[in-house]
Amino acid sequence: MPFLPGKMPKPAVCRRPATSFHADLAGGSRYLYWKHNATPSPHPRRPRVFRVQGDTAMDWQGLRFLGESPVDGYVLQNCTYSPSLVALAFLVACLAGYTALDMVERVGNSLSHPRLWQWIGAFCLGSGIWATHFVAMLAFHAPIALRYDLPITGLSLLIAVAASYLTMYMTARPRFGLLPCLLAACCIGLGIAAMHYTGMAAMRSVATQYYQPSLFALSVLIAIGAAFTALAAVPYLRGRRSARYRYMKLIASLLLAGAIAAMHFTGMAALVLSVPAGTPLELQASADSLRLGWLTGVLASAIAACGIWAAWSEKQRERRLSENSRVNALLNQLDHAHASLRQMARYDSLTGLQNRTAFNEVFVQHLENCRLRGKGLAVMFLDLDHFKRINDSLGHDSGDQLLKIVSERIRSVLRDSDVVARFAGDEFCVLADLTQDHEAHILSQRLMQKMKEPIALDGRTLVMTASVGVSLYPNDGEQCEELLKNAGLALHQSKACGRNNAQFFSRQLLVRATQELQMEEELRQALRDDQLELHYQPILALADGEVHQLEALVRWRHPTQGLLGPDRFIGLAEANGMIDQLDDWVLRRACRDLRSLHLAGHERLRVAVNCCASNLGRASLVDEVRHALEQAGLAACFLELEVTEDALMYNIDQTIPLLERLRELGVSLSIDDFGTGYSSLAYLRRLPLDALKVDRSFIMDIPASQRDMEIAQAIIAMAQKLHLKVVAEGVETPQQLAFLRENHCELVQGYLFSRPLPLAALEEFLRAYRFDAAPPLRSLNQA
């Protein structure tokens, strides 16, 4: 068979019967051949193969695809194959298909060099297709000598690699749908066919090759169809690690190998070899072909194995990179979280100012710098006046907005070297370097003046004031803690002086603070050790002169300072959260003492107990009163609770329901120190009250003060119009008593009748009073 273009040799003509079969059994050959003579037949049968002679034949490299049956020659049939090489060829195809799918997966998932993996996959698949063809051709045994043209064989390899690359390129698309899959299947299917028939063109022998058109077309369709089925699994191989992943990949590789093998052997089934007449036919030695086939198969398998190993190594590398990236991402997140936590730990999230933690660190550095340079330093506490009222009335969002505005204003006043921090709520702290002490006074005034500028907030215009406390280094301390403490004492003094002012630390403040701290500790100890006691001041009725009621007044018998009045420790108890415990003790002790007086024969006596503002904010007050009465065995009608105007007005909407519950319990209610606080007559008529107590400040200057007399008269008249009893406090002279009697005041108390007395002295007073008939009242009645 000629391989290069040119004129084909004319087959020899044999003079034999029209048609006959011959078996050449020389050397044990089982090859059959079919002879045609040159005598034309009047009824020619339909040709089974392609015609050799004539210009109508399609001739390329000695291959005939179209034409009539060959004449005057032999057609070789029933050529055999080496089973081991056929199996090896299929194994090579499987490895090539598996490697190609592995590369497809790499191209889709690779983090780097996807084009390189396309070329590696194309070479592995193309060389595998070519090796499958070549090993299968070496497995082909024909009774003629066969050899292969090297350039054309190399061309078939290039065709296989090129088709494989185009297929790899198509499958690398992110969206590999039905149409791209069909195009890729056509590409690889046609590439396999082109490689096969180009490789067949490289085969050289005395025979002429003919192809049956139907089988030829079927081989191409089989290659495309099987490739399409295999490539349809590509989308499922990307990013999938399910239980069926490996099975799907194996099945797809078998389908791709089947496409290669099916195309090859279908193409071989379409092949018909025709030899010239008289050509000797003998079985060729197959040992060399077998060795060459195995060598080729092993090399191709090694190439595929290297591709699989490379893909596996890349997977491991990318897995390590992915793990490292994940770890690095976690570390970055941790760093970011650490930075965020550090930011949150050092800076106020609302205003962006430093918080106490960061301020303390900066304070140490500032103080050390001032110490080295010999300069002064001012520590200022700034607290907004009545900020809680803003939160309660406008809401916390408005309060937060106000704090942002205030922080910006403080920044605008300070220098770049100064430091400002937000400690808590509406409290700010400033560090300012000083050359002279009077600069601190100037700065504090500038801060206070800046705070007074109008603020537009939620459609309102607000004017805020601030209290400032200042301590100076080195005059007021040389340590951070000491300077902060002293500035806090100065701020406390500023609030005590009416707010909206600046106070500088002095040693007297420290002495007072030390005393208050000691008093606080001793008061707690007094509550635990029962060092408190109640004194009772009688309240008399002007109508009959009888003692109708007692006011319970707490006293503290201090171990070193003696008997202390409530003005010495009530404020301390309120400031340190002990007032609730103190009021509860007074209530229980007063109920118990009154019960003992009832048992002593004073059954009509009632007792009045003071109730602080914080107690009116507790819903448990009613239960505490009920428990104290039950524990003492006392009826509720004998108890009266006294509250101040300020306590009532502090939270009037919550106070009114609480007072109504106390009235339902049977407890009487009165307003203590009436006229000294702020109240509204509209609220006064809504309150469930029984009595008003005129403060002693309106009684003490009667009759010298005409204004006080008019105020007292107005209060008494108003109470009578509201059907409330009136109790006048601080009655100390007969003139005051006469004035109250003339204005129809019902009840009086004061030093004119008795000082507050302990229980034992009170019992003596009641016994003596019963028989003495109250000299002041008796003389007044006689007059």
UniProtKB/Swiss-Prot annotation:
SUPFAM superfamilies: EAL domain-like, Nucleotide cyclase. Residues 516-770 form the EAL domain. Keywords: c-di-GMP, Cell inner membrane, Cell membrane, Hydrolase, Magnesium, Membrane, Metal-binding, Transmembrane, Transmembrane helix. 3',3'-c-di-GMP binds at Q537, E551, R555, N610, N615, D672, R696, E732, Y751. It catalyses: 3',3'-c-di-GMP + H2O = 5'-phosphoguanylyl(3'->5')guanosine + H(+). Residues 375-507 form the GGDEF domain. Mg(2+) 1 binds at E551, N610, E642, D672. Disruption phenotype: Inactivation of the gene impairs biofilm dispersion upon exposure to NO but not dispersion in response to glutamate. Disruption of the gene does not cause a biofilm-related phenotype under standard conditions. Mutants exhibit an intermediate virulence phenotype. InterPro entries: Cyclic-di-GMP_PDE-like (IPR050706), EAL_dom (IPR001633), EAL_sf (IPR035919), GGDEF_dom (IPR000160), MHYT_dom (IPR005330), Nucleotide_cyclase (IPR029787), Rev_trsase/Diguanyl_cyclase (IPR043128). PDE activity is stimulated by GTP. It could also be stimulated by NO. The chain crosses the membrane at residues 84-104, 120-140, 150-170, 176-196, 215-235, 255-275, 292-312. Binds 2 Mg(2+) ions per subunit. GO terms for molecular function: cyclic-guanylate-specific phosphodiesterase activity; metal ion binding. This is Cyclic di-GMP phosphodiesterase NbdA. The lineage of its organism: Bacteria, Pseudomonadati, Pseudomonadota, Gammaproteobacteria, Pseudomonadales.
